[in-house]
């Protein structure tokens, strides 16, 4: 099975995905890390090259490479607007696509930054000084990607501001991820 975790930036896809993969004994991929490795550049360089559609096409090419790995896996998917490049990946048999959601306030609390070398750091003083800007940006992302993913990703999961371990436990329960679907030939195809 392949589990794709969608969501806006800073919702917690990577942390949740790593923990979920560990708990299930799956391989974990973070699309941002794979893009950096595949194109041999920092994320800062990547997001400043070409147009958004070109970058989404490149991200989708990396997702197709990840999909070639036949092991069970969890994939944290960076926000992609041009989903037509990845439609076929999500609609395959044995694929579960989940959009992780949370309130703008909870996402703001998780907000981190990265420098030009992709080193992640917290800067709460800066974050709170520009709270209005970031809250508006988060709200716009939630609205935009909610529309973009509405047809592609049928499973919506409210994180409720919980700790990542609690989110993982609820994901496992809600989607029965501890159940063996191999004999049933589960066809999640983006829905429970």
Predicted regions and their residues:
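Hydrophobic anchor at the beta1->P-loop junction of P-loop NTPases
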Residues: 5
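P-loop (Walker A) phosphate-binding loop of NTP-binding proteins
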Residues: 8
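NTP-dependent small-molecule kinase module
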Residues: 19, 23, 96, 143-192
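Conserved substrate/cofactor phosphate-moiety recognition/catalytic segment
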Residues: 22-64
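Glycine-rich phosphate-binding loop used to anchor ATP phosphates in small-molecule kinases
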Residues: 54-96, 100
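ATP-binding Walker
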Residues: 11
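A glycine- and Lys/Arg-enriched "phosphate-lid" helix/loop adjacent to the NTP-binding pocket
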Residues: 94-145
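Walker A/P-loop
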Residues: 14
């Amino acid at each position: 099975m392949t589990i794709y975790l969608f969501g806006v930036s800073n919702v917690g896809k990577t942390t949740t995905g790593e923990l979920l993969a560990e708990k299930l004994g799956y391989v974990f991929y973070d699309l941002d890390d794979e893009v950096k490795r595949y194109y041999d550049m920092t994320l800062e360089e990547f997001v400043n090259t070409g147009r958004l559609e070109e970058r989404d096409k490149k991200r989708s090419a990396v997702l197709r490479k990840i999909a070639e790995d036949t092991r069970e896996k969890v994939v944290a998917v960076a926000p992609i607007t041009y989903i037509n490049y990845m439609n076929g990946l999500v609609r395959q048999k044995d694929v579960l696509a989940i959009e992780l959601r949370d309130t703008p306030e909870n996402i703001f609390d998780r907000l981190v930054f990265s420098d030009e070398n992709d080193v992640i750091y917290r800067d709460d003083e800066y974050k709170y000084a520009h709270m209005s800007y970031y809250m508006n940006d988060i709200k716009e992302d939630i609205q935009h990607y909610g529309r973009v993913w509405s047809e592609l990703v049928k499973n919506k999961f409210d994180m409720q501001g919980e700790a990542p371990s609690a989110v993982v436990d609820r994901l496992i329960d809600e989607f029965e991820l501890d159940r063996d679907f191999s004999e049933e030939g589960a066809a999640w195809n983006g829905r429970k």
